[in-house]
Amino acid sequence: MSNTILQQLPKGQKVGIAFSGGLDTSAALLWMRQKGAVPYAYTANLGQPDEEDYNAIPRKAMEYGAENARLIDCRAQLAHEGIAAIQSGAFHISTGGVTYFNTTPLGRAVTGTMLVSAMREDDVNIWGDGSTFKGNDIERFYRYGLLTNPNLKIYKPWLDNQFIEELGGRHEMSEFLIANGFEYKMSVEKAYSTDSNMLGATHEAKDLEFLNTGIRIVKPIMGVAFWRDDVEVKAEEVTVRFEEGIPVALNGKTFSDHVELFLEANRIGGRHGLGMSDQIENRIIEAKSRGIYEAPGMALLHIAYERLVSGIHNEDTIEQYRINGLRLGRLLYQGRWFDPQALMLRETAQRWVARAITGEVTFELRRGNDYSILNTESPNLTYMPERLSMEKVENAPFDPVDRIGQLTMRNLDIVDTRDKLGIYTQTGLLSISKDSFLPQLNKKG
């Protein structure tokens, strides 16, 4: 068995812990200190919409026994990766055309690399986090951690039998903190678990594991409960501008800071509940899970970007963009966002698709994912209405004689197709009858 994963607490050694300030990591940090480890706490500022005071988290870690505690601002990098995902269409999970924007995988890519980089600065080469053995994050953090520090060792209290035996549940952890002089009041248990960052929120587990429990039990943290009749949502016109694939302006206001742009996009989309979806997905280990997601800003930018893609690029380029995006989305989900095959797909889209995306899209947002596109403008549009106008136009690009020639050339593949269908009929692959959708194939001429 690999010695990369430590199954017992490394006493006397520095252990970095991804510290959220919640019950689990608070109890784990105190327990590790009491059992002889030297814990270092690292907190990622990912712009979580449900976090009120980031600066209080490192202070809390020091109270629980951390040797040192640092707050790492990851927002700029997260915004950068979010834009890269939009540029490359790195989204592979959707239901009925409603997309999940891989916001948790993007957050893990940033957290896993930036926290381990900070640990290296402190000569901390053992890392622990709160991910469980059934989820995706245990593998994502494992990959990103070892990519960033090849000498990294992994210690997770939740894989340590001694920790589980002593502090195996929320009640035990709460009692442990109280017994050690900390006034910890357990929060009221929600009917589901929430994880969030600046790009989006994930609601899953507990009651949401049952498919007969839906979005109506969720209290959005980035938007409104648009499905409720008592929630007023007014229609709103919104304009989004891109320059060379980069979102630069919302409603005429230019943003040089991508973090501020995402925050404003979240506010705009959130007023309507835009970007919420209910998805059944395949986890990395191939078992299916269910999540309800929020991503108002990502959805807003994605709509505008894809509208410009469809108006600027040709059919084959769009097809390749979509195929590559599906593959890239899956790699991102699996924790492979910085693997060579993912970088290849990303750079292809960013170079050959995104660089041409300059323009402005105006649309009307209503409730949830209900919207209408009102206008599309770009100096790079290849959509030219005069080419296919139903009215008579001067200097038409082609005339009836040209189309006759084009149709005549189609005779070649039509004849070939008919011959192939005849072969399939003779071999029994197709059955010809009066009720068949191809009843005339057995007739000559």
From Swiss-Prot:
Which GO biological process annotations does it have? argininosuccinate metabolic process; L-arginine biosynthetic process; urea cycle
Name of the top EC class for this enzyme: ligase
Residues noted as binding L-citrulline in the record, renumbered to the chain = Y100, N136, R140, S193, T202, E204, E281
- Signal sequence, start to end: none
Q: Any idea of its EC number?
A: 6.3.4.5
Q: Where in the cell is it found?
A: Cytoplasm
Q: Which organism is it from?
A: Pasteurella multocida (strain Pm70)
What does the entry list as the binding residues for L-aspartate?
A: T132, N136, D137
Stated name of the protein: Argininosuccinate synthase
What the entry lists under InterPro entries is as follows: Arg_succ_synth_type2_subfam, Arginosuc_syn_C, Arginosuc_syn_N, Arginosuc_synth, Arginosuc_synth_CS, Arginosuc_synth_type_1_subfam, AS_cat/multimer_dom_body, AS_multimer_C_tail
State the encoding gene. Answer: argG
Keywords, alphabetical:
Amino-acid biosynthesis, Arginine biosynthesis, ATP-binding, Cytoplasm, Ligase, Nucleotide-binding
Question: Main location per UniProt?
Answer: cytoplasm
Q: In which pathway does it act?
A: Amino-acid biosynthesis; L-arginine biosynthesis; L-arginine from L-ornithine and carbamoyl phosphate: step 2/3
